[in-house]
Amino acid sequence: MYGYWSHFLCDVGAHEISRKRRYRQEKFLETTGYLFAFRNGLVEEIPTDVAEDTIIPYYVYNKGYMIGYAEDAKVYVKWPTDMKDWMKQKKRAADAHTKLTNYVKDFPKVKSFFGEIIWGVVGLGKVLRYPKTPKEFLWTVFLFPTRMAMWISLHYELKFKKREYSDGWRENLEVESTRTLD
């Protein structure tokens, strides 16, 4: 189920609803941290508490370069295999996006709680066409309250527990089930 959810969020959310549309409109678009490249010397410093796959393309885009989008690129990713790791990964990524305006005041918000709701409704046809089996349809339905729980939990941790997320390869933020096999 966690692999399906991860594929769904990438295929439908990141690519179908966001990146393809923004690329066609020649707007700023986020890259994926799983595969992106940029010309040496364009970025001097990368903050560790934000989404590097978003801040780096913004720096490049802000210098007048167009961000390319290779729709057919293939990347193999080991997704989380349990709820604890899935939540940890998603909360870390969501929080990293909330901090972007700390570095760039006019940052074009692409990923947010309200953005997920709005674009989920706008792209509802794509959302409902993605599942191929009844089991996948149920997993898709279960994803919505799980994402809501993730956002509520993140908000609670940030506002009331004063928890700060940072670079995922430090502290206890590494997602254990996504580590490669040795």
Locations of the language-model features?
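Long helical/loop segments within the catalytic core of UDP-sugar-dependent glycosyltransferases
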Residues: 1-44, 87, 91-94
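Catalytic donor/gating beta->alpha subdomain of glycosyltransferases that bind UDP-sugars
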Residues: 1-5, 9-11, 47-111, 115
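Residue-identity detector for glycine
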Residues: 3, 13, 33, 41, ...
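Short C-terminal domain-edge/linker segments immediately following a structured domain
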Residues: 21-28, 66-68, 98-102, 176-177
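Residue-level detector of alpha-helix boundaries and kinks
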Residues: 27-28, 45, 75, 130, ...
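Short, conserved alpha-helical segments within structured domains
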Residues: 34, 52-53, 141
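Terminal low-complexity segments of carbohydrate-biosynthetic enzymes
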Residues: 95-182
